Amino acid sequence: MKNFFSAIGEKIRANRVAVSIIAIVLAIAIVVATIAFVLPDNFFKNLVSGESNQTVVSVDSEPEPEPEPEPDNSFEIKMTFAGDTIIACYKDITSSGSFNEYANKKDPSYFLEKIKPIFEKDDFTFINLENVLSDKKLTPVERDYSPAFWFKSKASNVNILTSSSVEGVSFTNNHTNDYGTAGYNDTIATIKAAGLEYATQTKTVYFTKNDYKIAIICSGLWYEGQSADIIRRVKEASEVSDFQIVFFHGGTEKVHAPDNYKVRAARKIVDGGADLVIGSHPHVLQPREIYNGVEIIYSLGNFCYGGHRRPENRCVLYQVTLNFDKEGIYTGVNSEIIPCYVYTGSVNNYQPAVIENEKEKQRVLDFMDGKVDSPL
């Protein structure tokens, strides 16, 4: 009987072991199935092949600060110069088709409306004003030469300039004293009241942008010896400015070649320290040259010109651009000549405009570079 119960006990223990083994196997199967479900499909394949199946866990960390961009202090200064401007009539006489008739009928913005978009985009626009602005009845001064001309208009004609983004004028020419001291003083007062900068034979215009200062020295240039006084003024201006421009008035009228004395004088002015030299007075274009690295423009021609019904119908705007790098340091200058018509009608309608015709435009550019004898 004892052996009987021992056999039964052994059998029960064996069954328990079998059950335990089965339970363990089932547990392992469940674990494996669970792992297989959550792991990537190629896990076991990679495991067999020996490929790594490690998962890289990204740990959040403080991002490295991006380096601050270097400050960019680059900029440019763009200036536009236009030539002989007479917004008036001979002795202030109004006749059919005259400038005065147009000025009485048209809004001031009419005269320069085709050029204004250029002036609006620059930093400073400067023209040569060749008439008296006064509402007084003044007597023309006597001249000891013939033919002589006197130009005067109502003071409100200054709005032709201010309405079209002109910022400064040279009142340094042979017409500033057409009506004596009274006419001169009235004109200066009108210019100042309009908020325009102005230069005279003794007063220099200064324009500043981002602490860079440009001087515009205006003067008559009727003989070579006048260059000495201009050079003196250039040197004085250089003590308080960074870039010196000379805008002179002189030479023989209605000829396309600059006088020999004017060429010699302009070159002396460059040797005396001027950074740019620009001329006016001939009422026609004269070419430019580069002398010792400095540009000389001998005549810009007319601009808005009320002095004649049929003046030569070519002129230029001269634009100069000074460039500054990221550190705000001056790096050099470049220029552009913009060929224009003095008027756009069959006769003078006192409304200059940019030349669009490519052949006519190129003719003017070739003339200014000395390649042809006439801009027409």
Residue map of PLM features:
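Acidic, metal/ion-coordinating pockets
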Residues: 2-3, 18-376
